[in-house]
């Protein structure tokens, strides 16, 4: 018997818990920021713009008593109907199918019809924990107003529990972990204790570039783009990464590149620095732009992209 098997058996005997936790909510309520704080490391991209998360991202947090496997989902889309958004909504539904706990995230003092649409998608026989995020905002600093808001949302659904947090500042994150833990099944850990994601380096590189696109472009343009890793080569002390950004029109390509190529250069430089920090190695990054008209409504092409 190897040491890992022995330790896993010891943990099971001590009531160790391990399970899957889906983080869901309408776009832009802070789901990705919340997951990054829960696992203690940035692996899911964040932006003030909606729909930055397109793929389900698995983050893992392990302590002495439990292992939490978090699934960060795209924000459920009720606007901008196209094949891409239909596929993103299907991703949310699929993510809910095999989890032990659902964390439903709403923005403090703001419960909308879009939140209600997400609530209707939640499973009836899986524990759902309400998380009220952004309690650092001025309107949420009144304790009595916040308590009234939580009561209002709890009246909409049979939640197993509720917690108010600030994902941005990491407030009450430890409390949330303790709230989730009893709903995880008793089990040995599924992943090594030092593992924080099951996603590949290629996937993480792609996500970093997408984050920079959302950060440095306008409100609409990033939604008409997709990022593809064309080549990823790992050498001794250097990762060579070649990434194509797919756009719908030549005019979008010009906007992305910017005057004299300055915008694309800035996006590429910041993405490279983030990759070097994440991968703990030097990175050579080449980013270029390709035009493919109508890609967001091409179902076959979306399947090829894994969406």
From Swiss-Prot:
Gene Ontology CC: one annotated term: plasma membrane
Cell membrane listed as a keyword: yes
Recorded superkingdom: Bacteria
UniProt GO BP: ribosomal small subunit assembly
Keyword GTP-binding annotated: yes
Main location: cytoplasm
SUPFAM superfamilies reported for this sequence: P-loop containing nucleoside triphosphate hydrolases, Prokaryotic type KH domain (KH-domain type II)
InterPro entries: G_ERA_dom, GTP-bd, GTPase_Era-like, KH_dom-like_a/b, KH_dom_type_2, KH_sf_prok-type, P-loop_NTPase, Small_GTP-bd
Domain KH type-2, residue spans: 217-293
Protein family per UniProt: Belongs to the TRAFAC class TrmE-Era-EngA-EngB-Septin-like GTPase superfamily. Era GTPase family.
Cited function: An essential GTPase that binds both GDP and GTP, with rapid nucleotide exchange. Plays a role in 16S rRNA processing and 30S ribosomal subunit biogenesis and possibly also in cell cycle regulation and energy metabolism.
Subunit structure: Monomer.
Protein name in the entry: GTPase Era
UniProt source species: Neisseria meningitidis serogroup A / serotype 4A (strain DSM 15465 / Z2491)
The encoding gene: era
């Amino acid at each position: 018997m190897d040491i890992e098997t022995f330790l896993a058996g010891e943990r099971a005997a001590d009531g160790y818990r391990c399970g899957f936790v889906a983080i869901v909510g309408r776009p832009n309520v802070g789901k990705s920021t919340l997951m990054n704080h829960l696992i203690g490391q940035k692996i899911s991209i964040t932006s003030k713009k909606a729909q930055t998360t397109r793929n389900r991202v698995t983050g893992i947090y392990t302590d002495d008593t439990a292992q939490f496997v978090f699934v960060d989902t795209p924000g459920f889309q009720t606007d901008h109907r196209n094949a891409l958004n239909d596929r993103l909504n299907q991703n949310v539904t699929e993510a809910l199918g095999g989890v032990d706990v659902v964390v439903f995230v709403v923005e403090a003092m703001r419960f909308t019809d879009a939140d209600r649409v997400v609530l209707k998608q939640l499973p009836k026989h899986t524990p759902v924990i309400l998380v009220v995020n952004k309690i650092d905002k001025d309107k949420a600093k009144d304790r009595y107003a916040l308590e009234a808001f939580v009561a209002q949302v709890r009246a909409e659904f049979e939640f197993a529990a509720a917690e108010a947090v600030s994902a941005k500042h990491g407030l009450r994150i430890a409390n949330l972990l303790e709230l989730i833990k009893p709903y995880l099944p008793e089990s040995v850990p599924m992943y090594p204790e030092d593992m924080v994601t099951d996603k590949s380096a290629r996937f993480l590189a792609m996500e970093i570039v997408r984050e920079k696109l959302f950060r440095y472009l306008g409100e609409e343009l990033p939604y008409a783009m997709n990022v593809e890793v064309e080549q990823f080569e790992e050498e001794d002390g250097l990762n060579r990464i070649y990434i194509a950004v797919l756009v719908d029109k030549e005019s979008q390509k010009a906007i992305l590149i910017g005057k004299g190529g300055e915008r694309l250069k800035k996006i590429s430089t910041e993405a490279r620095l983030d990759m070097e920090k994440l991968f703990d190695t030097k990175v050579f990054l080449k980013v270029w732009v390709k035009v493919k008209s109508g890609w967001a409504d091409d179902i076959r092409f979306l399947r090829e992209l894994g969406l």
